[in-house]
A protein has these predicted regions:
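Short, glycine-/small-residue-rich phosphate/pyrophosphate-handling segment
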Residues: 97, 110-161
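A generic structural signal for alpha->beta connector loops
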Residues: 33-35, 128, 168
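Beta-strand-loop-alpha "switch" segments that mediate conformational coupling across diverse proteins
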Residues: 161-168
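A short acidic, helix-capping loop that chelates divalent metal ions and anchors anionic groups
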Residues: 170-175
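N-terminal beta1-alpha1-beta2 submodule of the flavodoxin-like/Rossmannoid cofactor-binding fold
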Residues: 1-110, 182-246
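Post-His helix in hydrolase/transferase enzymes
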Residues: 177-180
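Cofactor-binding loop segments of dinucleotide-utilizing enzymes, especially the Rossmann-like FAD-
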Residues: 8, 41, 135-138, 166
Length: 246
């Protein structure tokens, strides 16, 4: 089984909670025997779709842009059995880098209009891979992912194998929460293993990955607000805060 794991976080490894959770999941996939390639999209040149439809007319199936998407990423996407779309939650949906990647898969479809089950679709030129969506957010409520979930279900339909949404994700990197973080990451690895073995992730495993961490919202909010006030007063970004105070 060939799996492409895309990480659209702009943050470097070790800082990115998207990467931390994805790394654990990929570990399980590899234990299950999958051939997994991880790609940090922040290191790739992927231009915006310009809506020219060259990929539908002049060069069917090939984008007008000669960039990393056309030369490398799109062919790998087409060759994959499963693609994991790992993105931080920005303004309640995928971040801009992931959205650009998704838009650039347009050459896999043809321009014509078909209606299936009451919905209009473009016919598939090249069958897209199955999808898994992984996202993390700072807010503690799972409800913050509702818009993203609606979007990816519309986008991938029956090709969506699993959705993994981790609220209060900053906590998994804090030493005081390491016992809970270990359980979450162990479950993420189990989810990767299950995906390879059965093309799905059990509800029990997803519940373990996404289990509530925050038991006292006021304490959680006070901790977060104290952190941000210190950053503002000291004139530090979060990464600079970490380097200074550990």
């Amino acid at each position: 089984m060939k799996i492409l794991a895309l990480n659209s976080s702009p943050r470097a490894d070790g800082v990115s909670k998207t990467a931390i959770l994805l790394d654990a999941m990929v570990k399980g996939m590899r234990e299950g025997g999958a051939d997994v390639e991880m790609i940090p999209l922040r290191k790739k040149s992927v231009k915006n779709c310009i809506g020219c439809y060259t990929c539908w007319t002049k060069t069917p199936g090939t984008c007008v842009h000669n960039d990393d998407m056309t030369r490398e990423l799109f062919p790998k996407w087409l060759e994959s059995d499963i693609v994991v779309y790992a993105t931080p939650l920005y303004h309640y949906t995928v971040n801009a880098r992931m959205k650009v990647f998704i838009e650039r898969t347009l050459p896999a479809w043809e321009p014509f209009l078909n209606r299936v089950d009451g919905r209009t679709h473009h016919p598939i030129r090249q069958k897209p891979p199955k999808a898994v969506v992984l996202s993390v957010a700072g807010f503690p409520e799972s409800s913050v992912f509702s818009f993203l979930s609606s979007y990816v279900n519309m986008l991938f339909g029956k090709g969506l194998l699993a959705e993994i949404y981790r609220p209060a994700s900053e906590i998994i990197a804090l030493p005081v929460f390491q016992d809970k973080a270990k359980g979450i990451l162990t479950a993420a690895a189990q989810g990767g293993l299950e995906l390879v073995q059965s093309m799905k992730i059990s509800k029990q495993t997803i519940d373990q990955i996404t289990a509530p961490i925050v038991e006292d919202f006021d304490a959680f909010a006070n901790m977060a607000n104290s952190f941000w006030n210190t950053c503002i007063q000291e004139g530090l970004t979060p990464s600079e805060f970490q380097k200074k105070f550990g």
